[in-house]
Amino acid sequence: MELIFLGTSAGVPTRSRNVTAILLDLQHPTRAGLWLFDCGEGTQHQLLHTAYHPGKLDKIFITHLHGDHVFGLPGLLCSRSMAGNVNPLTIFGPAGIREFTETALRLSGSWTDYPLEIVEVSEGVVFKDEQYTVTAGALNHPVECYGYRIEEHDKPGALDAAALIADGIKPGPLFQRLKHGDTVTLEDGRIVNGQDYLSAPQPGKKLVIFGDTAPCPAALALARNADVLVHEVTLEAAMEEKANSRGHSSTRQAAQLARDASVGKLLVTHISSRYDAQGCESLLKECRAVFPECELAQDFMQVCV
């Protein structure tokens, strides 16, 4: 999986940062997929500066309905349609996302030429297929807001072809069945269990993307043991009280949560427009003082999960 930050500013865009949007390129060997998390104003403009096309999007996950997270959605949906795309698209989001989307399209005389499904989520599993499970967890913000935990299912172990050949089993169609862990009967009557020739399953990656939140127990539970956590850091530690009063977190609080949840890497975003480049360096230092495995996101930054 690879994350591409399209917008990393809080509330309003700046000259160097657009408002919130994050692409997730699944890069799964058996399943192509491009997911978008939040869609602030100007997201489709940001996409134009990448190698990705809106037509490749198949899922959009909205954390909450504040404008800096959704005002880019109607335009993106329309542009995707005007490009002639007919591939289905599913939008997941809190209560109200259906009304917001349908009202924006209706009042502007717009429509989509592709199947559009809108799913209003609550806590729990919101999507599951053979490769991934996505779970929503409620966060602490003035409006209904969610974080999303994306879990890649464990991948089967690798087949030890050399061991099979050493045991007198020739390469061929049977190898594919053995790779799936099946038990097969050879021409000489031997029974071979594929599980005996497979390495241990490869654990799937765990990625957690938060919407806006002040510290809360649910956030800690959702982030537990994630390989990568994306967390907002709207304000510096000295302004923690102000951040919390508005449903946001400070640098110190985001880093503490990452440490307490035993995550592998912390990516901080949703930076207040009050901070210039030097200020952002200070924010990162505050985070790393508590949790060293931290990076401060920039627009168009790409991170492998």
Swiss-Prot record:
Cofactor field: Zn(2+)
Binding residue positions for Zn(2+) 2: D68, H69, D212, H270
Cofactor: record remark: Binds 2 Zn(2+) ions.
InterPro entries (alphabetical): Metallo-B-lactamas, RibonucZ/Hydroxyglut_hydro, RNase_Z/BN
GO molecular function, one term: 3'-tRNA processing endoribonuclease activity
Pfam families tied to this protein: Lactamase_B_2
The keyword Zinc belongs to this UniProt entry's keyword annotation: yes
Active site per database record: D68
Keywords (A to Z) from UniProt: Endonuclease, Exonuclease, Hydrolase, Metal-binding, Nuclease, tRNA processing, Zinc
Listed EC numbers: 3.1.-.-
Residues the record lists as binding Zn(2+) 1: H64, H66, H141, D212
Cross-referenced CDD domains: RNaseZ_ZiPD-like_MBL-fold (cd07717)
Protein function: Zinc phosphodiesterase, which has both exoribonuclease and endoribonuclease activities.
Family to which this protein belongs: Belongs to the RNase Z family. RNase BN subfamily.
Assembly and interaction partners: Homodimer.
Protein known as: Ribonuclease BN
Annotated source species: Enterobacter sp. (strain 638)
